[in-house]
UniProtKB/Swiss-Prot annotation:
Alphabetic keyword roster: ATP-binding, Carbohydrate metabolism, Kinase, Nucleotide-binding, Transferase
Ranges for domain DhaL: 366-568
SUPFAM superfamilies for the chain: DAK1/DegV-like, DhaL-like
Coiled-coil residues: none
Superkingdom in the source lineage: Bacteria
UniProt protein name: L-erythrulose kinase
Binding site for ADP: 398-401, 441-442, 483, 540, 553-555
Primary role: Involved in catabolism of D-apiose. Catalyzes the phosphorylation of L-erythrulose to L-erythrulose 1-phosphate. Can also phosphorylate D-erythrulose and dihydroxyacetone in vitro.
Record's catalysed reaction(s): L-erythrulose + ATP = L-erythrulose 1-phosphate + ADP + H(+)
């Protein structure tokens, strides 16, 4: 359990504030995360890392000279939003472009991918690299699906040293790709982690057993085996990792590697050293030369009892980068002169301009806000159940993420009503708030979907049924484009597609929007229930697909819940589109 916190909702923000207060000589806080507080080389590439909070020293503790220039920090176990990532990247940018690098998780891929597109559009050259070192999470022929765990550190260190050496963005990206291809990790867990305010851990391990292949967000392992001795565990980890040698290495003898034995938060350093004693012996017996190993907590999983072993297969350049000096709050190598402090900067929130809207669109905005309030109420009533469903094969955080997102969206909608926003603008700003506060995969998906719907609704008129159906179809297409999910993958898409089709078909026959929405929502509910018979093909549940059989997808279920709640709003709205197919010409031109 977590003993010390104020409010669970403020934990991530307050830990960042405390971290910056403790390390002001190395980092400063910016909206969305932290950046170096010391001067970096003008014209150099900026390395921006990031992910959810709860993994310290990753990610903020790895910001400093010789390491990252900035870290985007999401909520606990939730990826930072694209808005947060962009904010950190802009603050870290030195004129030579930005490399975004992070562990390979669906939410991070979505948010960092969107941030890359925004930054490039702004004129800041940007590339990204998702770390894929966890050998338990996918076979070698599907390495792109592997998770990023403690191997994050190896990649972050290599690319940061390359940037310090003056490499340009393309060359830094090449180093990132090579370092990633030469990094392998495997871990075990003895117990799950419990987040602040939670009564139960995200997952449990049967007494006397250990879960092999867990993820750093508490994802269950691929198999449970009896807890072994320290030497037996070392042998399991080393033998598993040596079965998968990077391409181009034909013999172990004479190879140079670096090693990280990483504690996940609940294993004592003394225990780690006992395990490393045997790890070192086994590697030397294979003729390997170990270069500057690290033993300790480097990429944790809050208070999970567990550890992981990472092998970093060096070439001449990667060894030079691994051994290069670094001075970050939680990671130091060699010696560096103190950095030149930067002048204090005050970040002023950007003024949010509200576009003009017609009276008809402003009236419709009240209905949109009511729909978001209804979504909030249904999610809050089902947070625990959504988390339970998600925990069957995932990390169990879906309910918490949806709660954060929908509350932020409903609050933003209220603010937009007070500022006389039209329906489209209100929904788009609510979408941004949802994505920013929820983080994670669900935050990215809902942000993309509601933004697309809001764009189609616009601020010029009261949307009729056809326009709403067009907006839902655009939302579906945007979600599939950014999330890469297809029908049958056991995701929200499996409920969204039938909803969109049913809504379009019914409004095209002349059915009123409230009635069409209600019937389409029923189709979505049935489709969501039917996902129980599917096996997940993407996301964190994929490695444990069989465990999810018989349980519906949490994202599809939450979507169906919200669609049903919105149906009640539409049917109770006396000024709904069913009695107002179009606004008056005077209103639409006002």
């Amino acid at each position: 359990m977590t003993y010390l916190f104020n409010q669970p909702s403020s934990f991530a923000r307050e830990l960042t504030e405390g971290f910056v207060a403790a390390h002001a000589d190395k980092v400063r806080q910016v909206p969305g995360g932290v950046v170096r507080s010391t001067r970096s080389r003008e014209g150099g590439v900026a390395i921006v890392v990031g992910g959810g909070s709860g993994h310290y020293p990753a990610f903020a503790g790895l910001v400093g000279q010789g390491l990252a220039h900035g870290a985007a920090m999401g909520n606990l176990f939730a990826s930072p939003s694209a808005q947060q990532i962009c904010s950190v990247a802009r603050a870290a940018h030195n004129g030579g472009g930005v490399l975004l690098t992070f562990g390979n998780y669906a939410g991070d891929v979505l948010h960092f991918g969107q941030a890359k597109a925004r930054l490039n559009a702004e004129g800041i050259p940007c590339e990204l690299l998702a770390v894929t070192d966890d050998i338990s999470s996918a076979p070698l022929n599907e390495w792109q699906k592997r998770r990023g765990v403690a191997g994050d550190l190896m990649v972050f260190k290599a690319v940061s040293a390359a940037a310090e050496a003056g490499y340009d963005l393309a060359a830094v990206l090449e180093v990132a790709e090579r370092a990633n291809q030469r990094t392998r990790s495997l871990g075990v867990a003895f117990s799950g982690c419990t987040l602040p305010g939670a009564e139960h851990p995200l997952f449990t391990v049967p007494e006397g057993m250990m879960a092999v292949g867990m993820g750093i967000h508490g994802e269950p392992g691929i198999r449970d085996v009896p807890i072994s001795t320290a030497d037996e565990l070392a042998e399991l980890l080393v033998s598993s990792l040596l079965k998968e040698v990077p391409h181009g290495i034909t013999t172990l003898s004479g190879q140079r590697i670096s090693v990280v034995l990483n504690g996940l938060g609940g294993v004592k350093y003394e225990e780690l050293f006992v395990v490393y004693r045997r790890v070192s012996q086994l590697l030397v017996e294979q003729g390997l030369t170990v270069v500057e190993p690290e033993v300790g907590e480097l990429v944790t999983s809050f208070n999970m009892a567990g550890l992981s072993l990472t092998l970093f297969w060096l070439d001449e350049e990667l060894e030079r980068f691994w051994r290069a000096p670094a001075d970050a709050p939680a990671f130091r190598k060699g010696s560096m002169s103190p950095g030149e402090p930067l002048a204090e900067r005050t970040f002023v929130a950007e003024l949010e301009v509200i576009p003009n809207a017609t009276a008809a669109s402003k009236a419709a905005a009240h209905c949109v806000a009511a729909a978001l309030n209804a979504a909030r109420d249904i999610v809050l009533a089902n947070v625990t159940e959504l988390g339970r469903i998600d925990a069957i094969a995932g990390d169990g955080d879906h309910g918490i993420g949806m709660e954060r997102g929908v509350i932020a969206a409903a609050d933003k909608a209220t603010e937009m009503l007070e500022r006389q926003a039209g329906a489209g603008t209100l929904l788009q700003r609510a979408a941004d708030a949802w994505a920013d506060q929820a983080g994670g995969t669900s935050g990215a998906i809902w942000g993309v979907a509601l933004n697309a719907l809001g764009t189609v609704l616009g601020d010029e008129q009261r949307p009729d049924g056809r326009r709403v159906a067009d907006g839902v179809r655009q939302a579906k297409e945007s979600v599939m484009h950014f999330g890469k999910a297809k029908p049958g993958d056991k995701t929200l898409v499996d409920a969204l597609i039938p909803f969109s089709l049913a809504l379009t078909q019914r409004v095209e026959t002349g059915m009123s929007l409230p009635e069409a929405w209600q019937q389409a929502a029923q189709c979505a509910q049935q489709a969501a229930d039917d996902t129980a018979q599917l096996l997940p093909k993407i996301g964190r549940a994929r490695p444990l697909a069989e465990k999810s059989l018989g349980t519906p997808d949490a994202g599809a279920i939450s979507l169906a819940m919200i669609l049903d709640a919105v149906s009640a709003v539409l049917n109770s709205d006396t000024t709904s589109t069913s009695s107002h197919q179009t606004a008056t010409q005077a209103e639409s031109e006002r």
